[in-house]
C-alpha cells in the first residue's frame, strides 16, 4: 500500500545560535552518541559547537514555532567526559529531562557503571526508555524500560520502537547475565506489525546498532517508515534510503556524535 506522507530531512550545526524550525505536521529533532558532552567544545575543529547546552537553545527556539516537536535520542548519552566520571551519569539524565527528551533507546555505554547504577539514574528520567529486543531479567530495570511507545501529534498516531545491538563483549558479564538478546530484525518486524494493527500512521525505529545493521534491518523489514540510529557515530549529510520487503522506502538517519549536529525531520501527512 502506498504511504501518504512526505519526509524532509536536514542537519543543524549546534553552535551558539542555530536557525529554529518551521512548522510542519510533525517535527522530530534527533541526536545520538552525546557521550557526556555537556558543554560546547572549547578548541579544535568543532570549537564552539556540540553539547547539551547548545541543543538547549535550539530546542527552546524551535518549540516556540512547533510546540509539539518530538525530541528523540538514539543512545550512548553517557561516558566520555569528566562529567560522567565525577557525577556518574546523573548530569546527563537531568540534562535530557531539561531538554524535554521524549524517548531514547539503550546504548551500550548506559551500562558502564553496572545495572544497579543504571536503574538508579533511570528512576529520575522523565522520558521513555525503549528497548524491545532484550528480555530483561533484572526486575527493577524491566519496570523502567518498555518495548515501544505510541504518541499522538496533530491527530496522527506515531509509534516508536527501541532496539539495541548485541551487548556481548561491550558490557560486563554481570549485565549480560540479566539481559537476554533477541534477534533485532525479527523483533523489529513483530513490533512494527503490532503498531500497524494499533493504527499507527508512522512507525519509527530508534536504534543503537550502527548504520550497517540499520541498513540490513531496513531491507528485511515491513511497516517501518523511519530508522533513527546511533552507535557508529556516522555523520549522514543525506539520509540513506532502502527498499523494504514490500518495496516501500525506509529512511535511515544518524547525526554523528557529541551533539555537534542535530538531525531535523519535517513530516507532512
Residue ranges and their predicted role:
Residues 21-269:
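Acidic, metal/ion-coordinating pockets
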Residues 7-16:
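Bacterial N-terminal signal peptides
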Residues 1-4:
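Positively charged n-region of N-terminal signal peptides that target proteins for export
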Amino acid at each position: 500500500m502506498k504511504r501518504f506522507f512526505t519526509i524532509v530531512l536536514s542537519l543543524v550545526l549546534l553552535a551558539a545560535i542555530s536557525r529554529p524550525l518551521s512548522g510542519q505536521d510533525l517535527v522530530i529533532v534527533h541526536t545520538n552518541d552525546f557521550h557526556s558532552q555537556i558543554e560546547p567544545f572549547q578548541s579544535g575543529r568543532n570549537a564552539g559547537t556540540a553539547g547539551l547546552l547548545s541543543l538547549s537553545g535550539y530546542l527552546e527556539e524551535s518549540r516556540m514555532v512547533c510546540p509539539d516537536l518530538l525530541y528523540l535520542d538514539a543512545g550512548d548519552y553517557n561516558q566520555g567526559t569528566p562529567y560522567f566520571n565525577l557525577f556518574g551519569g546523573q548530569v546527563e539524565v537531568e540534562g535530557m529531562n531539561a531538554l524535554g527528551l521524549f524517548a531514547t533507546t539503550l546504548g551500550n555505554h548506559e551500562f558502564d557503571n553496572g545495572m544497579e547504577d543504571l536503574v538508579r539514574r533511570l528512576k529520575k528520567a522523565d522520558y521513555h526508555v525503549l528497548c524491545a529486543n532484550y528480555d530483561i531479567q533484572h526486575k527493577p530495570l524491566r519496570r523502567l524500560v518498555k518495548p515501544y511507545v505510541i504518541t499522538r501529534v496533530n491527530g496522527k498516531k506515531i509509534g516508536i520502537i527501541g532496539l539495541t545491538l548485541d551487548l556481548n563483549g561491550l558490557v560486563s558479564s554481570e549485565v549480560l547475565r540479566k539481559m537476554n538478546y533477541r534477534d533485532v530484525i525479527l523483533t523489529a518486524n513483530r513490533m512494527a506489525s503490532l503498531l500497524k494493527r494499533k493504527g499507527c500512521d508512522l512507525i519509527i525505529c530508534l536504534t543503537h546498532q550502527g548504520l550497517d545493521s540499520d541498513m540490513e534491518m531496513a531491507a528485511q523489514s515491513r511497516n517501518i517508515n523511519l530508522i533513527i540510529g546511533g552507535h557508529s557515530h556516522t555523520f549522514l549529510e543525506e539520509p540513506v534510503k532502502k527498499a523494504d520487503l514490500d518495496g516501500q522506502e525506509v529512511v535511515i538517519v544518524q547525526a554523528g556524535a557529541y551533539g555537534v549536529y542535530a538531525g531535523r525531520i519535517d513530516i507532512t501527512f
